[in-house]
Amino acid sequence: TQKVPLWLRLTATDIPGHGSAPRVTSSVKRILRAGTRIADTQFERRAVPEVQAYFAALAPFQDGERQVMMSNISRAVDNDAFMFTLQMEEPWRAALLSNTCSLTTLKGSNKINVVPPTAELELDCRLLPDQDPQQFLSELITIINDDSIDITRIMGFTPAISKTDTPLYDAIEI
């Protein structure tokens, strides 16, 4: 099972100006606020069936509490302490359990004393394979909560769940 890439560009527009006369609002302030809201969001955690099977297969090789949690990952996603530890120690595994967005590119003025008319933030979002991208975009719009920010889809794929009941997968398991 592979998460589905959805790359987005957020663009904020506001009145430009000079750095010596700060405005109440600016494109940079708007884009930073949007980025903070996204970065602070914990998207719903859940395990699709293939990911449940993956964690269950790893569980016997874990110790103590971690073994218990991984053997029933669908329940463990509600345990904040376990999920925090997993995120800190194995972020690639934690990422399998929710939609994610990494803030990757930030653009504003090319001069230190110029407040730009536009500022951009690019996101590398990865969606669970059964997630509807349009529904996710709607959720993101709600999180951003700023109608003046434009969202452009740079790239996105259709959902894809890899089958695990194939001869190749059987050979890998052996």
Name what the model sees in each region.
Residues 60-61, 116, 161-169:
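Short glycine/threonine-rich loop-to-helix capping motif typified by GTGT followed
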Residues 15-18, 156-158:
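A short, flexible beta-alpha/helix-coil linker loop
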Residues 12, 125-127:
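Hydrophobic beta-strand positions in extracellular immunoglobulin-like domains
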Residues 55, 151-165:
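A short beta-alpha structural unit
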Residues 172-173:
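Phosphate/diphosphate-binding loops
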Residues 1-8, 19-105, 114, 129-149:
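Acidic-enriched catalytic cores of C-N bond-cleaving enzymes acting on peptides and small amides
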Residues 6, 119-121:
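Hydrophobic core residues within well-ordered beta-strands of beta-rich domains
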